[in-house]
Structure formats: C-alpha cells, structure tokens
Amino acid sequence: MPTAVIESLDHEGRGIARVEGKAVFIEGGLPGETVEYRVLRSKPNYEQAEATRIVRRSALRVAPRCPHFGVCGGCSMQHLDTLAQAATKQRVLEDALWRIGKVKPGIIYSAIQGPAWGYRYRARLGVRLVPAKGGVLIGFHERRSSYIADLGVCPVLPAHVSALLPALKVLVASLSIADRLPQIEVAVSEATTVLVFRNLLALKKADEAQLRSFAETHGVQVWLQPEGPDSIVPLHPRSGPGLTYTLPEFDVALDFRATDFTQVNVHINRLLIRRAMQLLQPAPGERIADLFCGLGNFSLPIARRGATVVGVEGSEALVARALENARRNGLDSRTEFHAANLFDATEDSLAALGPLDKLLIDPPREGAIAVVKAVGPAQQPARIVYVSCNPATLARDAAVLVHEKGYVLRGAGIANMFPQTSHVESIALFERP
C-alpha cells in the first residue's frame, strides 16, 4: 500500500496529501498523519483515496461515537476533535473567500459553537426495502453511494428520535406499502415530534392502524405526504400541538410545519441570530430588508429591536407562515412580507422595496448573485449581513460586493451548525467605507 503525509483537510473533510506532484484526497486522514491508502479513483491531476491504516496518528484524532461512522455518509468528521472541526471549517471559509473572491475579512469572528451531539432537530431519513440485506433499511445515504445505510442508532439526532430507529424499521416492514415509502421526514420542536411518511401509494386501513398505534406508543405525531411538501396531512392525532421553536432573547415564537425549511440546530440558530443582530445593529426608525426570509427567523428579531422589516421569500407558503408568525408575536405593524423569486432580482425589483438602511441576506446554497448584482445607485444599504451555507457562493458574491459595489468585508466567521460533518455555515458583514 502507498503511504502519504496529510497536509490539510478539504471542504469535504478529506485529507489532502501530495504524492509525486499529484494531489491525493484521502478519506479518513487528518493533518499531520502518515497513512497508508487505497486509490478509489485516479485522474490526471488528482486521486481520490481512502485511508486503510494510520501509521502515525494525530493528537486531534478521537474515537468516533457512532458505530456506523465510515459507512454512513451523514457524518464525515467524527474522528476529529470538535474544536478542531470548527478550526478546519474556519480555514475552509477563509480559503474560499481568498481563492474564489480574492477578499479577506478585516477580522475573524469567533466560531459559534453548541452541543456536538443530539442537535439535529430536522432530518430526512431514507427508507428502502432490501430483502437481501435483511429487510427494511432506514437512515442516511452511505458514503459515496445512493444506498441507504442501515442505522441502529444516530447520535446526532435527538436521543428519543435515535431510539426510535429500530422500532421504525419494524413498523415499515409491517406495512403493505413498505416498498413504496421512500422517506420519513423528522421534525422536532420543544414540545412535539412529527414523523412525516412519504407514501407513494394509498394506505390500507390496517396500515393506518399500525401507524396510529406507533404514534400512541411512542408519543409522536404521524403525518402522511402523498404528493409534494404541501400535501402533508395528520394521521394521528388528527389535531394536536403544532411545531414551534422559540427565540427567548427576542421574545419570539415561530410556528412551522414539518416540511417547512427551518434550521436543524436550534441552539446554533439562536446564537447565529444573536450574532446577526450584533452585526446588523437594527434600530427604531430604520428600514431593513430580510431577503430569503423564510418564515421570519431573522425578520421578527429585527422587528423586535424596533426596525421596520421588509421580508422577501420565494415560497408563498413560507410567506404566509411569516405573516402569521408576525401577527402572533404582535409584530405585524412593523413587518411586511412578499413572495418573489430572488434569483431573478434586478435593480428595479430591489428599488421597488423602497429605501433600505440595511440588508440581511440568508440564501440557500446557490447564493445570492442576482441580489448582490442588483445593489446599485437606487439601493445602497450602508450595511449588509450575509448568512451563508456555502463558502463558495459566499466568496463569489463577496467578490461582487467588494470589487464591483465598493463594500468592505469587515468580518466573517463560521457557525458550527452541523457538528461531525464538513458542512460550513458562516456569517459575514459588509459595510460601505
């Protein structure tokens, strides 16, 4: 077996080594380690490989907590100390900002950290009936594969959800549509756990009875999703407490449905909002836009600080949820929400929002290139806070703001929203000089 010395980690958590002038990306290797490896794929300029033996160990290597680590693709960094994970993600962010955007933040914000385990309050579990593997499999995709990893436990899920996995497999195996049920959506709030079963075929009465019994036995709500995300309906109980998460620092509670987009990590979400408010500094009399606002996660805290908020979101269902959340929190007089496709934003559409003092952007992985290009003579907010879930698109958009629009990147830092994974969430502040 060939050997290599790992120099650093890439954005997927793989070790990077140089062997005879070629980059080798080695799964399972950590910086400073000498590893034996097996090549999985060879290209002219690089190779993909996996470590087969650790010859010299890093002091930052830890024992993975999950017995499925290495097979399940849900986590890629359980073998690395949690603090070192955050440091690695910070380096990934800084590298992307410079390599792609040719920008450097004035300061690096301290990493936003929270619980390393049991944090994942939302998850989409794949389901497959595979008789050759013993029946029903429930879990995330296997690493480098479309197959489903057969999970008995999952320590990044809340403990009570992880404990349900064996019983869920038995439940699905008992249903007449076991081979036509591709996923189970999990949504956990402070008082409620909802399981949404994606049923491609109608359930028989015996199936419904099994699901009701499961819901009662385990104290969860069972919903069905026969079509798209908006088709979900409760099976048992027919009516019960809804899903809500709270932001105590801002005296805000937000209602949501199981298939709505919300942050998976409630602890980090609260700290991220606190950081965003510290950077944005909303004040009474200001008019602030929250773009990609979802159901009001940032909008309502901004409004609670006294500013007027204009929220824009592509999903009409989420706009309706934001309007209702504003009303329930007594903030409807300081908020307005609109449905619009921000990927088609123009100078005119941004100007139509009216004069803006500041801007908060929280886009999906695709980033907000149309929005940042639309910042122009008619709309020049003094301060922009950008919350990102993809360093590459943040760096691309930062290049436009800094090199074309005249903003200064005052600071940037990561929020460890997904511990044990290579996912990098971050926040950045841009200001006019």
UniProtKB/Swiss-Prot annotation:
Q: Main EC class of this protein?
A: transferase
Highest taxon above the source species: Bacteria
Mind listing the UniProt keywords for this protein, alphabetically?
4Fe-4S, Iron, Iron-sulfur, Metal-binding, Methyltransferase, rRNA processing, S-adenosyl-L-methionine, Transferase
Record keyword Membrane present: no
Give any Pfam family that matches: TRAM
Entry annotation: catalytic residues: C389 (nucleophile)
- Annotated coiled-coil positions are none
Domain TRAM: start-end pairs: 1-53
Single GO BP term: rRNA base methylation
Residues that hold S-adenosyl-L-methionine according to the record: Q263, F292, N297, E313, N341, D362
Q: What is its EC number?
A: 2.1.1.190
Residues recorded as binding [4Fe-4S] cluster, renumbered to this chain, are C66, C72, C75, C154
Q: Give the Gene Ontology MF terms in alphabetical order.
A: 4 iron, 4 sulfur cluster binding; iron ion binding; RNA binding; rRNA (uridine-C5-)-methyltransferase activity
Listed under catalytic activity are: uridine(1939) in 23S rRNA + S-adenosyl-L-methionine = 5-methyluridine(1939) in 23S rRNA + S-adenosyl-L-homocysteine + H(+)
HAMAP family in the cross-refs: 23SrRNA_methyltr_RlmD
Q: What role is this protein assigned?
A: Catalyzes the formation of 5-methyl-uridine at position 1939 (m5U1939) in 23S rRNA.
Q: Which family does it belong to?
A: Belongs to the class I-like SAM-binding methyltransferase superfamily. RNA M5U methyltransferase family. RlmD subfamily.
Protein name, UniProt field: 23S rRNA (uracil(1939)-C(5))-methyltransferase RlmD
